[in-house]
Amino acid sequence: NELNYRIRANGGKIFLSNQIKLAYYCRDTLTGLMKQARLNGKWTILTSKFVPGSMGLRHFVPLLFLLSLIVLPLLSILHPFFGYLLLIELILYAGLDLYASFQGNATKPKDIFIKFWIYPLYHLSYGIGSIQGLWSLRTIQDE
């Protein structure tokens, strides 16, 4: 994201071709995937600080999601509206999660079940990483 942003900002173009071949090595454990998500979240915050405009709004959605899961239950103590808002958010998320879990080549119930749980774990890990990134910014600015 940041490299593409700098290339375009300096008048360059991004070349896309379906003839390019590559090998992608995904994380082979859930712990590894969650660590990757956490680090992605952290570096999204740091990159956006040092290269403003390089990250899109979608990169901050997991942080907002995590914060809503923390703040809305607390606010619901003050007014039931926030509890309903949280309920609507969770129903929408679960519905989108279920829909996404059935997409792609996952046809076995076990695979769909795993995907259903991986999406929220990834998003929450990414959000935690974003909070770590915000904390890192605070420490960097103190130096």
Residue spans for each PLM region:
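Catalytic donor/gating beta->alpha subdomain of glycosyltransferases that bind UDP-sugars
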Residues: 1-55
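Histidine-centered active-site/metal-ligand motif
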Residues: 24, 59, 123
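Alpha-helix N-cap/helix-start motif at coil-to-helix transitions, marked by capping-box chemistry
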Residues: 35-38, 61, 89-92
